[in-house]
Regions:
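Loop/turn positions that initiate beta-strands
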Residues: 1, 163-169, 245-249, 480, ...
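Boundary regions of SH3-family modules and the immediately adjacent low-complexity/disordered segments
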Residues: 4-151, 185-226, 266-298
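Intrinsically disordered, low-complexity acidic Ser/Thr-rich regulatory segments
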Residues: 100-174, 400-432
Length: 504
């Protein structure tokens, strides 16, 4: 039997239910919170863990988890220091449109991430929640709805690998006799020991609304240790002046000069102050206006060289932010980890979906041609490290980005990601990546809760946005996702997708 669903389409009763009192429906009532940049609570797996289907006994835990006693002893000693979080995406005050309010604060009755206890950081609504009804008595009253099928008697359904990003909807203390252990509830209703999860609040970074008081061109300062310069008249020389903080926004005059082989931009407020181009992400209009601009339509402008995204309504810029595109920046997307250039239209939108560590997803409409499997990123990192070390031995001049990568190599870190490799490396899963908008097979705009290096290319080809920006862009683009829906494929009934222009 088929039911018509609002506002368009049909659903078959073989695939859904209208009985809202079913245990599974009641157990899964906590849905994605569309009012927040991160629609779920998130964390990262610090040690391989079973994904339990019911509350395990202590004996079952010992059989299922390697060196459990040693792990729990270590956790009890370090719990307070390792489970702390910084303020994140959901802690930034937003207006009704989802734009960050400069200097704004949430009402005092709303808890910030650094005020929450561990249960709340893992998705619980209250500090000390009871055991969910569907897990009472050591049983499970609902079916296993994960993609990993197991017999009904199974204690757990698959293990979750270290570094996996988890989306969470709850947490509670499970009790087995005198043994007490906290469990987090994943979106697919499997249980993961809280001692093996590091909660995370995502990046609080965000872009800005553009208007008469914030005209373009301007730039974000990307580099730590950035300085302003004075250009010496009649000499091929630029002398350093003052320190300029990272991620500060600097108005530009539109004038550039070359000194000693480096490009400098003149600041808009002080004509004698110049900044190095390599320290900046510049927001400027395109050299020529594309078709949607001339038609007065909404469109998205992405510069791979500058790592910036600008939303336009016709020829009027309305919002700008930093992004992270494919890590090889301007390479061939068929053979490198680069974002394709060209004109595209959004083809699907999803509130959240799982991705693997190469940003492939079941909702992507196809894989990228550069997808290489779990070992591809590791081999690429090794090749990059070898190239940089050889260049240093040969005395070759390195770009600022390569200098950063070489410093990471010498510290024993991944050249591209540095210490953030712990949250975004090899063959693992990133669950419920938020605010996904596909513009080509395997390529999407989406939120990234696993890093905070926006302005630096580091993805496998997708366009990474900070969660606040990702949500705002998702809500701004067409067509809108109908109320109560989790995603749409763009078609004639939904309206045309917003145009995305990706250029050098």
């Amino acid at each position: 039997e088929w039911y018509r669903v609002y506002p368009t389409g049909y659903a078959c009763t073989d695939e859904f239910t209208t009985d809202i009192e079913l245990p599974l429906v009641r157990a899964s009532q906590k849905r994605a919170d569309l009012s927040r940049p991160l629609p779920y609570r998130y964390g990262f797996v610090r040690a391989t863990a079973p994904q339990y289907l019911r509350i395990p006994t202590r004996a079952e835990q010992e059989r299922s988890e390697f060196q459990l006693k040693e792990h729990l002893d270590w956790y009890r000693e370090h719990e307070h220091e390792i489970q702390q979080v910084a303020l994140g995406a959901n802690d930034v005050a937003l207006d009704r449109r989802g734009i960050a309010i400069p200097g704004g604060k949430w009402p005092t009755d709303r808890k910030l991430s650094n005020q929450m206890n561990l249960n709340e950081l893992l998705g619980a609504e209250i500090p000390d929640p009871p055991i969910p009804f569907w897990l009472e008595g050591g049983k499970r009253l609902i079916p296993n709805v994960s993609a990993f099928g197991v017999p009904d008697y199974a204690v757990f359904a698959d293990r979750v690998r270290r570094k996996t990003g988890l989306s969470l909807v709850g947490a509670f203390d499970g009790i087995d006799g005198e043994s007490r252990r906290k469990f987090a509830i994943a979106v697919d209703l499997r249980l993961i020991p809280a001692s093996k999860i590091k909660p995370d609040a995502g990046s609080p970074f965000h872009g800005i609304e553009l208007n008469e008081s914030v005209p373009i061109p301007f730039a974000w300062v990307l580099s730590d240790g950035c300085k302003s310069y004075r250009l010496i008249k009649g000499k091929d020389e630029a002398r350093p002046r003052d320190d300029v903080p990272r991620r500060v926004i600097v108005p530009l005059s539109g004038t550039a000069r070359i000194k000693a082989g480096q490009r400098y931009y003149q600041t808009g407020k002080e004509p004698t102050q110049w900044l190095r181009a390599e320290d900046l992400a510049v927001v400027a209009p395109p050299e020529s206006w594309p078709e949607p601009a001339n038609k007065g339509e909404k469109w998205i402008d992405i510069s791979l060289r500058q790592q910036v995204l600008v939303l336009y309504e016709g020829k009027k810029p309305v919002y700008a932010t930093l992004v992270s595109t494919g890590r090889d920046r301007l390479g061939d997307p068929k053979t490198t980890l680069s974002t394709p250039q060209g004109s595209f239209r959004l083809r699907s939108k999803h509130v959240a979906a799982a991705m693997d560590s190469e940003e492939n997803s079941a909702v992507s409409g196809g894989s990228r041609s550069n997808s290489s499997g779990a070992n591809g990123s590791e081999e690429s990192s090794k090749a990059t490290a070898a190239r940089l070390l050889e260049a240093e031995r040969d005395g070759k001049k390195l770009s600022t980005e390569d200098q950063r990568r070489l410093l990471n190599v010498k510290k024993g870190r991944d050249p591209e990601y540095g210490v953030t490799r712990r949250r975004g490396s090899l063959g693992f899963e990133l669950r419920d990546v938020p605010w996904i908008q596909y513009f080509a097979s395997g390529y999407a705009l989406h939120g990234a809760y696993w890093h905070d290096v926006f302005g630096v290319p580091r993805s496998h080809g997708c366009v990474n946005l900070a969660p606040i920006d990702a949500r705002y862009v998702f809500m701004w683009t067409d067509p809108p996702v109908p109320e109560g829906w989790h995603g749409i494929n763009v078609g004639s009934e939904m309206g045309e997708g917003t145009q995305v222009i990706i250029r050098e």
